[in-house]
């Protein structure tokens, strides 16, 4: 389901949310919320087992990750995706550029995380020749 190195999964396990099937407790879907800055996070690695797609499980994962972002005080959530329509249903909108102030950008440059490097669109990261779309959601404060 995921094409990530096992070490990466262990490093990021606390960021993940998973959905299990009731009948046999097997993994049905996953997704991660990676906080990049005090008010900015990325939704990463949303995946649903192929025979469980179309059942709303992926949407439930994203809803849970957005709820976690709100609890943490995150106000902007970013994703880099091919599933534009899927994320648009959650309010994400396509963006261009990097939506952070210059001083935050310079701090983020210190990160070793490849996802942060992709967010910053750094030259050392593979160019976006596949057509991924950068999307952003501005979260409203809870009432």
Question: Where are the predicted features?
Answer:
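C-terminal "cap" of GNAT-fold acetyltransferases
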Residues: 100-143
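A conserved beta-strand-loop-helix scaffold within acyl/acetyltransferase catalytic domains
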Residues: 1-16, 20-23, 28-49
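A generic local structural motif
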Residues: 3-6, 62-66, 121-122
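Conserved active-site alpha-helix within GNAT-family acetyltransferase domains
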Residues: 71, 75, 81-109
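Conserved acetyl-CoA-binding loop-helix of GNAT-fold acetyltransferases
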Residues: 48, 54-69, 78-79
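Beta-hairpin (beta-strand-turn-beta-strand) motif
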Residues: 46, 82-84, 140
